[in-house]
A protein has these predicted regions:
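Cytochrome P450
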Residues: 1-164
């Protein structure tokens, strides 16, 4: 649906922003192009384009000491899950070599797993590769402050001003 079409645009902007603002990340990916896929997954983990999902509990359950009744509305934070320090050491660090970057839950999990996740991942990776190939001197425009991703659905920077 619309999320599968819009997500690669947001994900590409977020991936490029992280590559351009994390010391050594862009240089590592340029030196080892095989890292682009992992860098995309790491950016999907750290800055998911959709940060929360709404669900209804199908059974009563206790999570971290909180009781949730069957039928209750639950808001799931993908952004928080993707920064779980029990799963991702140094969870707030963008690491293009993170061994388990693909273990993120940006595309949900289980029966609600995004059916377009593979397409979104391939499109994002292709867009990042194309940008890096087309603009070897790509960098943030120094006359503008580095943007920050914003929003809870289609989260991305409002603008990514670059020069090359």
């Amino acid at each position: 649906g619309v999320q599968t079409c819009a997500l690669p645009i947001c994900a590409t902007a977020n991936a490029l922003l992280l590559l351009l603002t994390t010391p050594g990340a862009l240089e590592a990916v340029r030196a080892e192009p095989d890292l682009v896929g992992n860098a995309v997954d790491e950016s999907l983990r750290l800055e998911p384009s959709v940060v929360r999902l709404d669900r209804y509990a199908t059974v009563a359950v206790e999570v971290a000491g909180a009781h949730i009744e069957a039928g209750e509305f639950v808001m799931l934070s993908l952004a928080a899950a993707n920064r779980d320090p029990a799963v991702f050491p140094d969870p707030d660090v963008f690491d293009v070599r993170r061994a388990n970057a693909r273990q993120h839950v940006t595309f949900a999990h289980g029966p609600h797993l995004c059916p377009g996740m593979h397409l979104a991942r391939v499109e994002t990776e292709a867009a990042v590769r194309a940008a890096l190939d087309a603009w070897p001197g790509l960098r943030l425009d120094p006359s503008h402050p580095a943007p920050a991703p914003a929003g809870t659905i289609f989260r991305k920077p409002d603008a990514l001003r670059v020069v090359w």
